[in-house]
Amino acid sequence: MSAIRFPGAAVPVVLAMLGLAGAATAQGDQPTLLGQYSDWAAYAASPGGKKVCFALAKPKSSQTNPPGRPRDPAYMFISTRPAENVRNEVSIIIGYPFKPSTDATAEIGATKFAMYTQNDGAWIKNVAEEARMIEAMRKGADLTVKGVSGRGTQSTDQFSLKGLAQALDRAEAECK
């Protein structure tokens, strides 16, 4: 049986902080870059007075089938929200609405993780596997996300994991 974590306010907060979903209104909403570590960066912010820290990366490559389908930028982030007792939540914003009632997959080497999808976001379906996924990400070279859009377009995004461990360590230290 899978344990599904239904996303809270983290995705809209992070998107707003990055300027992807409208302007952030308060100064605390603006993320502070804690450090850039190769392909990953660490950030912190305090929207609504609640501290949020996260490691963030863009894909190194993106493909669609059929080829050339337009979409918004994709991002992967791992967030820690102490006020919500959330630590190392893996999230993906894929840049298009996923096909309803479908899962995405995240692959690190030969290890696959099912991802629950909602609108343009994906989260690990079985929360009990999240620590194992983080450990695989820390040890891996890249992570591939595969999903299907509401229009049936298949996508494959490859994220480099170079710098992830350092960015994650920095974000975790900031949000102790």
Give the label of every model feature segment:
Residues 10-21:
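Bacterial N-terminal signal peptides
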Residues 1-6:
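N-terminal secretory signal peptides that target proteins for export/translocation
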Residues 8-11, 99:
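Hydrophobic alpha-helical segments and their boundary regions
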Residues 25-176:
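A generic "folded-domain core" signal
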